Design a protein with these regions (language model features):
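Short, basic/glycine-rich phosphate-binding loops at helix/coil junctions
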Residues: 1-3
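Charged catalytic cores and adjacent phosphate/nucleic-acid-binding surfaces used
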Residues: 6-125
Length: 125
């Protein structure tokens, strides 16, 4: 957490370099990056993370993406899924990486019902 940029500014050159180096490492190792909505859902943050510019940079590198609510209770499992999917779409993503039946698959962002999630808007948080 970095409320109101208390500790650093994401626009600072050193921070941007660290983020880009980290994304390069994710790409080199075939790792998946997540959009995490947990802090937003629990009221601890004003936004999901990572920031939109980071998601866009990940897309440029074709880093697989996963949306994660970091839910601590079942009722929060889909918290802000629609907003996270929209952030991913704006950056050019059309799928997210999901573990289904013991294997990783790329699943379209616009069909959360396939994942057993309610239709968009039915459990607005």
């Amino acid at each position: 957490r970095n409320p109101d940029e208390m500790y650093y500014r994401e626009s600072d050159g050193w921070y941007r370099r660290e983020v880009l180096d980290t994304l390069d490492a994710l790409e080199a190792n075939g790792a998946v990056m997540e959009i995490n909505t947990g802090g937003l859902a629990r009221g601890k943050c004003h936004d999901m993370y990572p920031s939109e510019w980071i998601v866009a940079e990940a897309r440029k590198r074709n880093i697989p993406l996963q949306i994660n609510s970091d839910a601590h209770h079942p009722e929060g499992i889909d918290s802000y899924y629609g907003a996270a999917a929209e952030r991913a779409r704006r950056s050019g993503y059309t799928v997210q990486r999901v573990l289904l039946g013991g294997e990783w698959r790329d699943v379209p962002l616009d069909i959360p019902a396939e994942l057993g999630m309610p239709p968009e808007g039915s459990s607005a948080r």
